[in-house]
Amino acid sequence: MRRFLFATILDICTMLDRHRQKKTLAPSLAVLDSQSVKAPHASDRGIDAHKKIVGRKRHVAVDSDGRLLLVNMTPANVADSTGAQMILDAMYRKWPSVKHFFADGAYERKSLMDKATYLGFVVEVVKRTPGQTGFQPVAKRWVVERTFG
């Protein structure tokens, strides 16, 4: 019950903030990303082999200004594209106005693209410029990185 109360409060705050910024109440675009976090004592955890982290993974969707729309927690060993499919299902029900998603290269998977097409979404994979090293925010995805900040 509390989880739904928190989600409802978050949705209302998101819409009020969008209204204050003179935007439509419901977003039409979202940015997807995930972040692995250490949680050695969590009962439902996994190992993110790429980042060598034992814990959980946050899969998030934010609007064009970085407002949190959805969060999904999974064990860290769940692939980004699998977590994104769960986000797409929830977005279809909760924010039907969102039709376009930006994501990084980890989301360029046939299963995710098929799911997005089936639900009527467009997932645009935004890659870094060739030869780029280290962390540099990518123009269309920086808002989600700032949200993790």
Provide a role label for each language-model segment:
Residues 1-149:
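Short alpha-helical elements
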